[in-house]
């Protein structure tokens, strides 16, 4: 298992803050089982796999946007209902 460095990831992402957001979204996709990894899992945690995908240039903001599926989460639906009533 090769180490992933921030510098490897920053070759494909504009800045560290964007890297944090991108890796968080991708790791969450992997952890919840909604998406398949694009690299070998090798007994790593979802965050490491997400960073490896970013370092290899496989996962980008465009990839995440295309892969995101809007789902109705009952927890957030309650907040949306309250905000719609206030208008």
From Swiss-Prot:
<dbReference type="InterPro" id="IPR036161">
    <property type="entry name" value="RPB6/omega-like_sf"/>
</dbReference>
<keyword id="KW-0808">Transferase</keyword>
<dbReference type="GO" id="GO:0006351">
    <property type="term" value="P:DNA-templated transcription"/>
</dbReference>
<keyword id="KW-0548">Nucleotidyltransferase</keyword>
<dbReference type="GO" id="GO:0003899">
    <property type="term" value="F:DNA-directed RNA polymerase activity"/>
</dbReference>
<keyword id="KW-0240">DNA-directed RNA polymerase</keyword>
<dbReference type="InterPro" id="IPR003716">
    <property type="entry name" value="DNA-dir_RNA_pol_omega"/>
</dbReference>
<dbReference type="GO" id="GO:0003677">
    <property type="term" value="F:DNA binding"/>
</dbReference>
<keyword id="KW-0804">Transcription</keyword>
<protein>
    <recommendedName>
        <fullName>DNA-directed RNA polymerase subunit omega</fullName>
        <ecNumber>2.7.7.6</ecNumber>
    </recommendedName>
</protein>
<comment type="function">
    <text>Promotes RNA polymerase assembly. Latches the N- and C-terminal regions of the beta' subunit thereby facilitating its interaction with the beta and alpha subunits.</text>
</comment>
<dbReference type="InterPro" id="IPR006110">
    <property type="entry name" value="Pol_omega/Rpo6/RPB6"/>
</dbReference>
<comment type="subunit">
    <text>The RNAP catalytic core consists of 2 alpha, 1 beta, 1 beta' and 1 omega subunit. When a sigma factor is associated with the core the holoenzyme is formed, which can initiate transcription.</text>
</comment>
<dbReference type="GO" id="GO:0000428">
    <property type="term" value="C:DNA-directed RNA polymerase complex"/>
</dbReference>
<comment type="similarity">
    <text>Belongs to the RNA polymerase subunit omega family.</text>
</comment>
<dbReference type="Pfam" id="PF01192">
    <property type="entry name" value="RNA_pol_Rpb6"/>
</dbReference>
């Amino acid at each position: 298992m090769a180490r992933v460095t921030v510098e490897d990831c920053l070759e494909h992402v504009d800045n560290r803050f964007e890297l944090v957001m991108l890796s968080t979204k991708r790791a969450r996709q992997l952890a919840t089982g909604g998406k398949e990894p694009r690299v070998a899992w090798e007994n790593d945690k979802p965050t490491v796999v997400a960073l490896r995908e970013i370092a290899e240039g496989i996962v980008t903001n465009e990839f995440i946007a295309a892969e995101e599926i809007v789902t109705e989460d009952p927890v957030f639906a309650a907040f949306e209902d309250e905000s719609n009533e206030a208008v």
